[in-house]
């Protein structure tokens, strides 16, 4: 089932999310719905808060990046078929010289900005079968994971750009909060205050 994606300004996007257990109600269905929602919106990652759930769950499918002409053959091979579910993730390490890449977010439609992130990460998480894993990633895969991990920590990519750049996107963010954004996918708009 395709779920509506929560838009910028909704308080759930600013929550530090709660861990879940393997007995979480409808976990398998929630994960399946998140993948369907992400694919419908042409995304490469989606975190549970983006569908209104304040839980430590996010998904990544970096395969679409594997067709890019701007990456090495080695990175393209790593991206090809990369699809994972991350539950109760903990970022153990972020290291290396930060590099910039233009990021966007399904909760912030039509906004893209350069964000600096470390190229190498070590992350601990449970997969969809609740098998505990500790893995290292680098490059674009690491970046997508960091972006989605930020969501479960209540952080958005717009928090990582300069004050100067924030001024340029201020009107777009306001439009999203006012329900004026019109992406090609279902969105749950922030309720207007009365």
From Swiss-Prot:
Q: Which UniProt keywords apply?
A: Hydrolase, Iron, Metal-binding, Protein biosynthesis
Residues annotated for Fe cation binding in this entry: 105, 147, 151
Required cofactor(s): Fe(2+)
- What is the free-text note on the cofactor? Binds 1 Fe(2+) ion.
Q: Which Pfam families match?
A: Pep_deformylase
The UniProt similarity line reads: Belongs to the polypeptide deformylase family.
Q: Which HAMAP family does the UniProt record give?
A: Pep_deformylase
From the Swiss-Prot or TrEMBL record, give the protein name.
Peptide deformylase
Quick one: which gene encodes this? def
């Amino acid at each position: 089932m395709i779920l509506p994606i929560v838009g910028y300004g909704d308080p759930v996007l600013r929550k530090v999310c709660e861990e879940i257990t393997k007995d979480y109600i409808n976990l398998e269905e929630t994960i399946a719905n998140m993948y369907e929602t992400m694919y419908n919106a042409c995304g490469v990652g989606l975190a549970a808060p983006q569908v209104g759930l304040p839980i430590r769950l996010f998904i990544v499918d970096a395969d679409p990046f594997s067709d890019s002409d701007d990456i090495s053959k080695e990175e393209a091979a790593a991206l090809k078929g990369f699809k994972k579910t991350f539950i109760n993730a903990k970022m153990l390490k972020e290291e290396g010289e930060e590099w910039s890449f233009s990021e966007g977010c399904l909760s912030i439609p039509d906004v893209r900005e350069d964000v600096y992130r470390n190229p190498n990460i070590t992350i601990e998480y449970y997969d969809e079968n609740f098998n505990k894993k500790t893995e290292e990633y680098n490059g674009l895969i690491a970046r997508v994971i960091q972006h989605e991990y930020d969501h479960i920590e209540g952080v958005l990519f717009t928090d990582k750009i300069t004050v100067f750049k924030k001024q340029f996107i201020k009107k777009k963010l306001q439009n999203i909060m006012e329900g004026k954004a019109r992406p090609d996918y279902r969105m749950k708009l922030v309720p207007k205050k009365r």
